[in-house]
Amino acid sequence: MEKIKLGKTGLMVTRLGFGGIPIQRLTEADAVKVVQKCLDLGVNYLDTANGYTTSEERIGKAVKGRRHDVFIATKTFPGTPDIIEKNLDLSLKRLDTDYIDIYQFHGINDKATLDKILDPENGLYKVFEKAKQAGKIRHIGITSHQMDAAKLEVQSDKFETIMFPFNFITNEPAKELLPLCREHDMGFIVMKPLAGGMLDDAMLCFKYLLQFPEAVTIPGIEKISEIEEIAAIYEGPKKITPAEFTRMKRMITELGTRFCRRCDYCQPCDQGIPISMIMTFPTFVKRLPPDWYLKSPFIPEGMEKAKNCTECGECESRCPFNLPIREMLKEGYNLYEQVKAANI
């Protein structure tokens, strides 16, 4: 499988990686088999997170005896220095390893949070640097869903990799973020290649991403058949045919008016409604086990705030994609109520 240099990390990673969210839904034995199949097919980049319940532990078991053949990336949400240190040690224990190749700040979507991380006196970046000096982590990365924040993160030159949503509908990174990553020699990791499950044509999705030679893509894998299909795409013809381009344009037209990119330009909401979280709730249902979102410390509280909508329409006036936000909020909340009732 083709490998590329992951920016200034210098790591030679496969262009096709592994995303560790879906294996939470599997039995441990099946999860281990899926990860090991990825390794057998040549995939050498595995992504997970402290918050993905059983994912780290299952990856740790899957790579037993093959640790030095793979690169493991995991992440932590920002917190206090003590919390970061505890999360890192927990990840090392779960993964059954004494080092993590890339440790990432998870979901940094605004300048204020980034500024706190990079504060020269008390920033959490210092905790990561300390861990790097101790040999617990080898490279420092960051993940984001918000373009303005992502640009600042790249321009800071403090991080070696960035992970960001990218697919042929959420295609803004092609012009706005990838050129910046090239300029700063920053590794670019693609999340949401299938738009969180909204796109179902794997061939189109991955052939589109194969047009960007510096991109490492980490689809969430749940079945052996999925990784076999995607690996075959990466080994096959990479040029997009006229017929495929036509299908792509049709799907953009069909989904573009109902697809939240989580840019959060609709915010702030006077009622404190987490708009993008509620509108993208259907992707949680598709990708995650119910306990993950129903017992989350913040998702149920956020979903309930949908009832506070006053229908003012301010969010819709700010949306650069002209989404019917008020209608989509109702749909997201109704789905939440259905899932909650089914899992009582």
Q: What is each PLM-predicted segment?
A:
Residues M1-V70:
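N-terminal binding-site loop/beta-alpha segment at the start of enzyme catalytic domains
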Residues L6, F18, C38, L46, ...:
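Conserved, mostly hydrophobic/aromatic
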Residues V13, L46, D69-V70, T97-I100, ...:
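Local beta-strand N-terminus motif with an aromatic residue
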Residues G19, A49, Y103-H106, T143, ...:
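Conserved residues at the C-terminal ends of beta-strands
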Residues A29, Q36, P81-I189, L194:
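Glycine/proline-rich, positively charged
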Residues L39, V43-N44, E176-V190, L194-I344:
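Structured C-terminal cap/extension of enzyme domains
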Residues N44-A49, A73-T74, R138-G141, T161-P165, ...:
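Short catalytic-loop micro-motif centered on adjacent basic/acidic residues
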Residues D69-I72, F159-N167, K238-E244:
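Short hydrophobic/aromatic-enriched beta-strand-loop microsegments
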